[in-house]
């Protein structure tokens, strides 16, 4: 799963390119119009009052620009940003060290904020609400609590699983925005912008071909652009035309809907081994040699969005669209099952 070209999960190779391609201001940020409008209004209001921005929660599938937006917020507010992640903040002391290093108005960005431990969360509550740290000195009956004042800061939290956030944490965010999958026309603009920055010659048709196979995700679009560039350099004249893009993506085993070998294997497993379903998540995971969480969080969302897979009370079911895409004839009972749910 980690080696999938079309995975929206960040890979080490993405880091350098992401930095060079990442927009710095809201005016440069393509797509997510509602989110941009909301954040822009609150940024302007906070700057007009000379106050830090209220705490912001960004949630949605991976690769849609949550980290980019956090950096844009810092740039628009004219402040510094400190970046960490839920798994990296293991102990309350780790969080206390970060919070005490912030200056007035700074942004603290916590990626995967749903993975913070409960003990760390409890330290975060007064920091978000009262801009203070409650520190316990000593142990036993002689222990006493000391409150340490913090500079007013803005916490920007990002998560792909908003449902795992506790209510006390979620309720302390003043601005909550959901990022959606990108439209093909927005991805075309992103591909063209990235191509200009990277010095890649690409036609409008070539950009569209890459965009429509990018699973609605800018990170995937930029990754595909780089790989198609390599193919064009070796197998063509270096220019990404529609024909070159189609050939390159076929070579990379990314089909016109953005599915790769792993997606097709999952669908074929359900169809060929379990008659199209319904079949349970644990059974599917065992059959494809993946963890259930990987199947549920990585594979299923895009297949469900395309309408090729359905979650029902009895289990997962492949739809007639999945059969047709794989060149198979939908079974009669498959059609009946999907219509019932």
From Swiss-Prot:
Gene Ontology CC terms: cytoplasm; Holliday junction resolvase complex
Keywords: ATP-binding, Cytoplasm, DNA damage, DNA recombination, DNA repair, DNA-binding, Hydrolase, Nucleotide-binding
Coiled coil: none
Enzyme class: hydrolase
Enzyme Commission (EC) number: 3.6.4.-
Residues binding Mg(2+): 67
Catalyzed reactions per annotation: ATP + H2O = ADP + phosphate + H(+)
Gene3D superfamilies: 1.10.8.60, P-loop containing nucleotide triphosphate hydrolases, Winged helix-like DNA-binding domain superfamily/Winged helix DNA-binding domain
Residues binding ATP, per UniProt: 21-22, 63, 66-68, 129-131, 172, 182, 219
Chief place where the protein resides: cytoplasm
Entry's Gene Ontology molecular function annotations: ATP binding; ATP hydrolysis activity; four-way junction DNA binding; four-way junction helicase activity
Region (Large ATPase domain (RuvB-L)): 1-182
Region described as Head domain (RuvB-H): spans on this chain: 256-341
Pfam families for the chain: AAA_lid_4, RuvB_C, RuvB_N
A Gene Ontology biological process term: DNA repair
Source superkingdom: Bacteria
Region (Small ATPAse domain (RuvB-S)): 183-253
Family, similarity comment: Belongs to the RuvB family.
Domain notes: Has 3 domains, the large (RuvB-L) and small ATPase (RuvB-S) domains and the C-terminal head (RuvB-H) domain. The head domain binds DNA, while the ATPase domains jointly bind ATP, ADP or are empty depending on the state of the subunit in the translocation cycle. During a single DNA translocation step the structure of each domain remains the same, but their relative positions change.
Function: The RuvA-RuvB-RuvC complex processes Holliday junction (HJ) DNA during genetic recombination and DNA repair, while the RuvA-RuvB complex plays an important role in the rescue of blocked DNA replication forks via replication fork reversal (RFR). RuvA specifically binds to HJ cruciform DNA, conferring on it an open structure. The RuvB hexamer acts as an ATP-dependent pump, pulling dsDNA into and through the RuvAB complex. RuvB forms 2 homohexamers on either side of HJ DNA bound by 1 or 2 RuvA tetramers; 4 subunits per hexamer contact DNA at a time.
Record note on quaternary structure: Homohexamer. Forms an RuvA(8)-RuvB(12)-Holliday junction (HJ) complex. HJ DNA is sandwiched between 2 RuvA tetramers; dsDNA enters through RuvA and exits via RuvB. An RuvB hexamer assembles on each DNA strand where it exits the tetramer. Each RuvB hexamer is contacted by two RuvA subunits (via domain III) on 2 adjacent RuvB subunits; this complex drives branch migration. In the full resolvosome a probable DNA-RuvA(4)-RuvB(12)-RuvC(2) complex forms which resolves the HJ.
Protein name: Holliday junction branch migration complex subunit RuvB
Source organism (scientific name): Pelotomaculum thermopropionicum (strain DSM 13744 / JCM 10971 / SI)
